[in-house]
């Protein structure tokens, strides 16, 4: 029988994480860890660390939060595969402290990005100062040299960036074959400084002289020597992806070589574009859309859930069979996103969600709806996802041996 897409463990994550392999019966490391920890708004943390910070004393409150997070991040590092990555959502209250802490636990050189996520497009209207409209996503590798995270997405490709159309209907754009970065030049990359031949009338390009072709060497706009982005063997292999054109530069008209950069390289596969470090609500969803999608499943029972679109974008950077861990599971967004992504692309991702039995606030929508603890919300959502999206669900006891 196939493993379910979603597994839930109720318990304090500091107790659960060291025994997670024993609890799940699987020692394999995790490819992706995502967490959305408490944002340190001044309330006590619902974890049994015997750590408390005075809400009025800023320094001690930050110290208490960091002390709460440190052992959990260390445990997460130990559970990560060497090729894996961790992503942590955070707001301005602790973004600076979290970054320093993760630099210490994972290594500054392992930091892959600090993404600004536009979760509140209207901006927070309460309080003084600017109307804050974003949070952050800090992303670190366990070993950046081996990390398999692919920071690109097919969804970020804008067809308007590809204005040219080939006779067969394929869209493309012209990119200079010349490397435009002056760090790469005949001194630093001598093997990429060579001449090719092109005919600006027909557009044809070859590595050797032909017909009415003219010799073209790579130069910068000011006429200084440059290098190509492609090696000579690659030009021999893909001459039809190149075109020779006349252009006007600072030194007057000249002949140059361009690459046809295709929107779709073949009939079955599209192209991917590097993700920027600003993620808009229109792309990944907002807090409002997250509340709405949770309301459809279990009701309006959680104040600030994350949208599944945010997690699906993150999941899209990892292999489609990734093992995923969320040990601040909250409303269960990560597990929901895993199921949606698997259903969309045929992947076999599996997610383990851990959440404590933190009591819901007295008089809150969640308590009125019958959810005594936040873990009850997590459980209800993941069960509902299994029923509606598929993939199965299991709950494991944190006390099993």
Question: What do the predicted segments below correspond to?
Answer:
Residues 16-21, 98-100, 334-340, 382-386:
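Short, well-ordered amphipathic alpha-helices
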Residues 1-323, 345, 358-361:
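Class I S-adenosyl-L-methionine
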Residues 322-341:
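A phosphate-binding catalytic loop at a beta-strand-loop-alpha-helix junction
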């Amino acid at each position: 029988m196939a493993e379910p897409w979603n597994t839930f463990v109720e318990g304090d994550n500091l107790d659960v994480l060291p025994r997670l392999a024993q609890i799940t019966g699987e020692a394999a490391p995790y490819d992706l860890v995502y967490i959305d920890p408490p944002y340190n708004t001044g309330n006590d943390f619902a974890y049994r660390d015997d750590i408390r910070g005075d809400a009025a004393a800023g320094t001690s409150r930050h110290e208490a939060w960091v002390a709460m997070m440190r052992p959990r991040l260390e445990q997460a590092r130990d559970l990560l595969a060497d090729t894996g990555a961790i992503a942590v959502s955070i707001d301005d209250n602790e973004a600076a402290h979290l970054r320093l802490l993760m630099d210490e636990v994972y290594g500054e050189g392992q930091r892959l990005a600090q993404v600004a996520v536009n979760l509140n497009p209207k901006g927070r209207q309460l309080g003084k100062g600017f109307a804050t409209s974003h949070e952050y996503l800090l992303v670190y590798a366990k070993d950046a040299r081996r990390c398999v995270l692919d920071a690109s997405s097919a969804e970020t490709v804008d067809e308007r960036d590809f204005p040219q159309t080939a006779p067969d209907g394929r869209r493309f754009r012209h990119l200079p074959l010349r490397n435009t970065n002056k760090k790469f030049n005949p001194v630093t990359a001598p093997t990429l400084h060579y001449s090719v031949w092109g005919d600006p009338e027909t557009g044809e390009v070859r590595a050797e002289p032909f017909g009415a072709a003219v010799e073209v060497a790579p130069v910068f706009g000011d006429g200084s020597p440059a290098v190509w982005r492609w090696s000579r063997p690659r030009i021999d292999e893909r001459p039809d992806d190149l075109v020779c054109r006349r252009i006007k530069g600072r030194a007057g008209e000249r002949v140059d070589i361009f690459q046809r950069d295709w929107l779709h390289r073949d009939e079955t596969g599209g192209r991917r574009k590097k993700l920027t470090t600003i993620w808009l609500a229109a792309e990944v969803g907002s807090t409002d859309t997250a509340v709405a999608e949770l309301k459809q499943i279990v009701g309006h029972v959680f104040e600030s859930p994350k949208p599944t679109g945010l997690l699906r974008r993150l999941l899209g950077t990892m292999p489609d069979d990734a093992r995923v861990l969320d040990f601040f599971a909250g409303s269960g967004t990560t597990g929901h996103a895993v199921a949606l992504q698997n259903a969309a692309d045929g992947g076999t991702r599996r997610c383990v969600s851990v959440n404590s039995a933190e009591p819901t606030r007295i008089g809150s929508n969640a308590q009125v709806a019958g959810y005594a603890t936040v873990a009850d919300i997590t459980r209800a959502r993941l069960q509902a996802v299994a029923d509606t999206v598929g993939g199965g669900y299991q709950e494991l006891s944190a006390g099993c041996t």
